[in-house]
Regions:
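Exposed, flexible binding/inhibitory loops of compact, secreted disulfide-stabilized domains
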Residues: 17-155
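Sec-dependent N-terminal signal peptides
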Residues: 4-12
């Protein structure tokens, strides 16, 4: 009887220790501002902002090219948070808290690795960049050879 009571007391604690919302972003790097800051967005196909998901040595390489961010990040920095919970990958890049500048700048590339995905499994990718902007989610199958490119303007 004591074992049953002990088991019933320990079971909820053990169930609460499952792996959820674990940070899994590694090697985050970015190129900084490309050229001068501006007060309006750039245009043209050569400036297309792309989000690329790529299989890399058992991990997911997430790369964003030509992202337009508030130029306050140059002084305050950027944060990248990634988590894998079940079949959902949440990936968030944002400027550190601080006063916003009255300008924007184009970041040629920012990239990091997301670990902990299972080969052959379908995932939903939830992406946000900058304060409060969430792109529509999409699904992908994590497998060798994966190279998925999304134009963020059409997401």
């Amino acid at each position: 009887m004591k074992k049953l009571v002990l088991l019933l007391l320990v079971l909820p604690i053990w169930a609460g220790c499952t792996k959820s919302e674990i940070s899994r972003s590694k090697e985050f790097a970015h190129t900084g501002c490309a050229g001068d800051a501006a007060t309006r967005a750039w245009g043209g196909d050569s400036d297309a902002s792309l989000l690329t998901l790529k299989y890399e040595d058992g991990n997911l390489r997430v790369t964003r090219t030509n992202a337009v961010l508030n130029c306050a990040f140059v002084q305050d920095g950027l944060i990248c948070e990634a988590s894998v919970e079940g079949n959902v990958v949440r990936y968030r890049v944002y400027e550190k808290e601080g006063p916003r500048a009255n300008c924007i700048c184009r970041v040629e590339e920012m990239s990091s690795l997301v670990t902990g995905l299972e080969v052959g499994k379908e995932y939903t990718f939830e992406y946000s960049c900058g304060f409060g902007y969430n792109y529509p989610s999409f699904t992908f199958v994590f497998k060798k050879g994966l190279r998925l490119i999304q134009n963020t303007a059409t997401m």
